[in-house]
Amino acid sequence: MAVTAEDILSRLKASIQQPVGGDPTAVNVGTVASVGDGVARISGLRDVMASELLEFKQTKSGETVMGIALNLEKDNVAAVILGDYLEIEEGDLVRSTGKIISVPVGQELLGRVVDPLGRPLDGKGPISASKTREVERIAPGVIERKSVSQPVQTGILAIDALIPIGRGQRELIIGDRQTGKTAIAIDTIINQRGQGMVCVYVAIGQKRSKVAQTITTLEQNGAMDYTIVVNASASESAALQYIAPYSGCAIAEEVMEVGVTVDGNLVKDALIIYDDLSKHAVAYRQVSLLLRRPPGREAYPGDVFYLHSRLLERAARLSEVNGGGSITALPIIETQANDVSAYIPTNVISITDGQIFLESDLFYAGQRPALNVGISVSRVGSSAQTKAMKTVAGKMKLELAQFRELAAFAMFASDLDAGTKAQIERGQRLSELLKQPQYQPIALEDQVIILWVAGNGFLDDVPVARINDFKRDFWQFIHSSYAEVGRAIASEKVLSEATIASLRKAVTEFKQTASYK
């Protein structure tokens, strides 16, 4: 049978009208115009959102690398590459995903170590999280919040007594390198066992060995059961270091808004530590300069204040209508030669609700934690302090601040009146009392007991060198002979008349049996 032209034409029409493998979809594709130092300029991409996730297809290896569109210019898009950019070449295809960068969140992340994209780093297998959250999010509004009213017990006597932190607060930890900033944060995480808190530790630009040491410490103290570690170490790209705190905050927001289960209880309070935001600002400066954004003071871009304010404003205490959860943020800033008036420190001080200032001179003098009581402050934490702690710690901060001034003055004065001498000796005893070894948090009831003893003059005849011996032995005596005192303080959170009477009896009895000379 001969095939006619009409047959061929009808078959062609039929094949054209027949659908081919599903519905066709439009894909937004561009090409790499130039690449270097982790930044790619892309031509041909249309309809790209700011901070949109882009997919780079490497021609040589065929592998896919992700990037973020940060500069949307007239004829090209500048993107930072999240990963190995050395294999990306000019002419490689780039596809827009239509998604803003997201991170896995939820129950599955507890006890895990992840990178800022939620990829596991601990060798414990993949994370099967069913939910993701965008890393950038607008902070809760004023109406959605409520005032800070519940304490975060750090277990550090000096902080819980003098600079109390509340759930939903932003409290800056600031000081020179090697003054114990990370130690305070880790101690606080360790003390959250049984306190109904989930902790997120974000390491930005740290050495891998230091992060591994921190994780080991948390594991040894049983703290990884309720902790998530987000790590963008110094060897990672500046882009990954830049998004790390936002990823950690998104993970914490899931806890605040939805909650996770810890030891069979639903927990909606999160504690997040940013260690540290100085390195975060440096990473952002690097990214901005590579994107050719105009530099400002200290070569930081003009929006470096907004970089940290939009992050720290996401820490909040939500109202009961909105679930009543909270995020408490402890950002860390490293200063140079105790200079708190530098650009980044002043920015973060103005954003946060107070600062814990650690001084290298105090640290090397053996005062650890090396807390400078004079310029450390908590603007909202006192309203979250328990009544028992308020009762015993009320005048203590003023006494210590006055002692530091008097001690400096006394160095040049030979004759001191009896009142000044007594005040200096009392200050020395209080300073000694506040010394505390690392990774040994103190329970609230023990803190209240020893501060009541000090505040009522029972330490005035104890030599300064024996204060720590007295403290240790008295706690042991209370736990064995007057355990009901600690239980009453822990449950009632107040110092009742009966509790005070029992305390007075206990300390009198203890001082009759033990001698500290």
From Swiss-Prot:
Enzyme Commission code(s) on record: 7.1.2.2
GO cellular component: plasma membrane; proton-transporting ATP synthase complex
Gene3D superfamilies per UniProt: 2.40.30.20, ATP synthase alpha/beta chain, C-terminal domain, P-loop containing nucleotide triphosphate hydrolases
Site label Required for activity, positions: 376
Pfam families, sorted: ATP-synt_ab, ATP-synt_ab_C, ATP-synt_ab_N
Tree of life domain: Bacteria
Membrane topology field: Peripheral membrane protein
Subcellular location: Cell membrane
Major site of localization recorded for this protein: membrane
Residues reported to bind ATP: 175-182
Top-level EC class as recorded in UniProt: translocase
GO molecular function, one term: proton-transporting ATP synthase activity, rotational mechanism
Keywords carried by this UniProt record: ATP synthesis, ATP-binding, Cell membrane, CF(1), Hydrogen ion transport, Ion transport, Membrane, Nucleotide-binding, Translocase, Transport
Catalytic activity: ATP + H2O + 4 H(+)(in) = ADP + phosphate + 5 H(+)(out)
CDD domains: ATP-synt_F1_alpha_C (cd18113), ATP-synt_F1_alpha_N (cd18116), F1-ATPase_alpha_CD (cd01132)
Oligomeric and partner information: F-type ATPases have 2 components, CF(1) - the catalytic core - and CF(0) - the membrane proton channel. CF(1) has five subunits: alpha(3), beta(3), gamma(1), delta(1), epsilon(1). CF(0) has three main subunits: a(1), b(2) and c(9-12). The alpha and beta chains form an alternating ring which encloses part of the gamma chain. CF(1) is attached to CF(0) by a central stalk formed by the gamma and epsilon chains, while a peripheral stalk is formed by the delta and b chains.
Protein's job: Produces ATP from ADP in the presence of a proton gradient across the membrane. The alpha chain is a regulatory subunit.
Family affiliation: Belongs to the ATPase alpha/beta chains family.
This protein's name: ATP synthase subunit alpha
Natural source organism: Herpetosiphon aurantiacus (strain ATCC 23779 / DSM 785 / 114-95)
